[in-house]
C-alpha cells in the first residue's frame, strides 16, 4: 500500500523543486543568451532569447571563413580564433600536466618524508597562494623580461613563459594531493619495499595507480584555471598570433566597434575544451574531491 504524504511535506517538496528550477534557470539564462547573440544577425548585445532569423555568419568568421554580405561585400575573419583556441589548449594542457607532476612529487615528500621545516614550508606555501596573481604582475614582467635574455623560450611573448608562470600555482594542489596520500595506508609501500622495490618504484607502481582520482581532479582544475586566465597571459603575450583565446577575445570589444556577435561565437568555442576535458574525467571527479580533503 502506497504511503500518503502529508500536505506539509508535499508543499515543502514542491517549494524545493521550484527553487531548484529557478536556480537552474538563473544559471542557464546567461549561457543561452550568449548562444542566442552568436546566432543573431548583426553585432547587437540586446534582443530576444530566440532569434527571429538564425544567422551563422558569426560562427563562419570564428571558424576562419569569409562571409558574403547582402550587398556583395566580402567580410574576412577579423581575428584568428582557431589559432587562439589551439594556443589556449596547448598552454592549458602543458601547464596542467606540469602542475600535476610537480604537485604529486611535492605532495609525496610532504606526506611520507620527514625533514626540518616541513610544517613551516606547508603553511608558507598556503599563505603565499592566498595573494592574487595581479599583485605580482610587475614583478612577473621584470622577471620574464630578464629571463628572456638568457633563455629565449621562456621570455616575454612566448608560450613557454606563460606556462612557466602558471607552474607557480601548485600550493593548493600540493595540499590536496598530500591529504589524499595520507589516506592511503603506508603498509602498502612497506610491503613493496620488502619485495625489493625502491622508494621511486613504490611511488610509481603502488601510490600513483591508487591516486588516479585526485590526479584527475587536479588536472581538470589546473586546465580550467589556465585556459580561462587573463591577467598574466595578457601581460606576457604581445603578438596577436600568440594570444590565448581568453586574451584574444578582448579584441572584439573595441571601444569604437563592439563585435558582440563575433565575441559570443568565440566565447561559446572557448567552453568546448573545458567541456570535453570535464566529460572525459568526470567519473573520477566526485571521488577525487571527496577523498582529497586536506588532512592536518
From Swiss-Prot:
The keyword Transmembrane applies. CDD domains: TM_PBP2 (cd06261). Residues 40-81, 145-150, 226-259 are periplasmic. Gene3D superfamilies: MetI-like. GO terms for biological process: maltodextrin transmembrane transport; maltose transport; negative regulation of maltose transport; negative regulation of transmembrane transport. It is a multi-pass membrane protein. Residues 1-18, 103-123, 172-204, 281-296 are cytoplasmic. GO terms for molecular function: ABC-type maltose transporter activity. Keywords: Cell inner membrane, Cell membrane, Membrane, Sugar transport, Transmembrane, Transmembrane helix, Transport. One of its GO terms (cellular component) is ATP-binding cassette (ABC) transporter complex. The chain crosses the membrane at residues 19-39, 82-102, 124-144, 151-171, 205-225, 260-280. Residues 85-281 form the ABC transmembrane type-1 domain. It is found in: Cell inner membrane. When MalF EAA loop mutations are made concomitantly with MalG EAA loop mutations, a complete loss of transport and complex formation is observed. This suggests that the MalF-MalG interaction may be important for the proper assembly and also for the correct function of the transporter. The complex is composed of two ATP-binding proteins (MalK), two transmembrane proteins (MalG and MalF) and a solute-binding protein (MalE). Protein stability and stable complex formation require YidC. Belongs to the binding-protein-dependent transport system permease family. MalFG subfamily. Part of the ABC transporter complex MalEFGK involved in maltose/maltodextrin import. Probably responsible for the translocation of the substrate across the membrane. This is Maltose/maltodextrin transport system permease protein MalG. The gene is malG.
Amino acid at each position: 500500500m502506497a504511503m500518503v504524504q502529508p500536505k506539509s511535506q508535499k508543499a515543502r517538496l514542491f517549494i524545493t523543486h521550484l527553487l531548484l528550477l529557478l536556480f537552474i534557470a538563473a544559471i542557464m539564462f546567461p549561457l543561452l543568451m550568449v548562444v542566442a547573440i552568436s546566432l543573431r544577425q548583426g553585432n547587437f548585445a540586446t534582443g530576444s532569447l530566440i532569434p527571429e532569423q538564425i544567422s551563422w555568419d558569426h560562427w563562419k568568421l570564428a571558424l576562419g571563413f569569409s562571409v558574403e554580405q547582402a550587398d556583395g561585400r566580402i567580410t574576412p575573419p577579423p581575428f584568428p580564433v582557431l589559432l587562439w583556441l589551439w594556443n589556449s589548449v596547448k598552454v592549458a594542457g602543458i601547464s596542467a600536466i606540469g602542475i600535476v607532476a610537480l604537485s604529486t612529487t611535492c605532495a609525496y615528500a610532504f606526506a611520507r618524508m620527514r625533514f626540518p621545516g616541513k610544517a613551516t614550508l606547508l603553511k608558507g606555501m598556503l599563505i603565499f597562494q592566498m595573494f592574487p596573481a595581479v599583485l605580482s604582475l610587475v614583478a612577473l614582467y621584470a622577471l620574464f623580461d630578464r629571463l628572456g635574455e638568457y633563455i629565449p623560450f621562456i621570455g616575454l611573448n612566448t608560450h613557454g613563459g606563460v606556462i612557466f608562470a602558471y607552474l607557480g600555482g601548485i600550493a593548493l594542489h600540493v595540499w590536496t594531493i598530500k591529504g589524499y596520500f595520507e589516506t592511503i595506508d603506508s603498509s602498502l609501500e612497506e610491503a613493496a619495499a620488502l619485495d625489493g622495490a625502491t622508494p621511486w618504484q613504490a611511488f610509481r607502481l603502488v601510490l600513483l595507480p591508487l591516486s588516479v582520482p585526485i590526479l584527475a581532479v587536479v588536472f581538470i582544475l589546473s586546465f580550467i584555471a589556465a585556459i580561462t586566465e587573463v591577467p598574466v597571459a595578457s601581460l606576457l603575450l604581445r603578438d596577436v598570433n600568440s594570444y590565448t583565446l581568453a586574451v584574444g577575445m578582448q579584441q572584439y570589444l573595441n571601444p569604437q566597434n563592439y563585435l558582440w556577435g563575433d565575441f559570443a561565437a568565440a566565447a561559446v568555442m572557448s567552453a568546448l575544451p573545458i567541456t570535453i576535458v570535464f566529460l572525459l574525467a568526470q567519473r573520477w571527479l566526485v571521488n577525487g574531491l571527496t577523498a582529497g580533503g586536506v588532512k592536518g
